[in-house]
Amino acid sequence: LCLITNINKFFTVPSNDLEMNLVKSKNIYLEKEYEKLLDFKNNIDIPYDYIITNTIVNSYGFDKILINGNDYDINDEVVNENGLVGLISKVSGKHSEVTPIYDTKILVKINDIEGKILRKDDNNNLIVGNLSNYDDINVNDKVYSNKDSYIGKVVSVSKRDVITEVVVETTTIQKNCYVAVIRRNA
């Protein structure tokens, strides 16, 4: 009987220790998530109301991003610490769908010159065209949405015949856990 008791003690972990280890592991995980959230909040500078949320799925179906929450309006801008990444395109039960910026065809501003997002290139850079005065656009100029959210910077300007296209380096949210949804109408 003593031998069986000793074997049981050796091969089993008392439930209190197991529970304590689970609580410690969960606490460590939550502390790391809290630090990530604080880092994100401290690295964004948005002069409007915004809601911080996290991505659930970064690329399901047709290049859409799924985020938590449904207290958003269609076309609310979604940003990470590096700039605009997309627009709210669908709001449902507990989640919302974000269309990546390269699929939005929105108007953008480069030095007060309007253009339109046409597509993305193989490196996920934006191609901006329909520019009215491309002579005033240079590499490293900043690009903003028509609502003044930073998008990225110009990395090249291509002029051929009457068509001018600008390549804009942008950010993605594939590696980012948190995003902010800007609420200008709230």
Name the predicted role of every residue range.
Residues 1-186:
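Extracytoplasmic/periplasmic terminal helices and flexible tails
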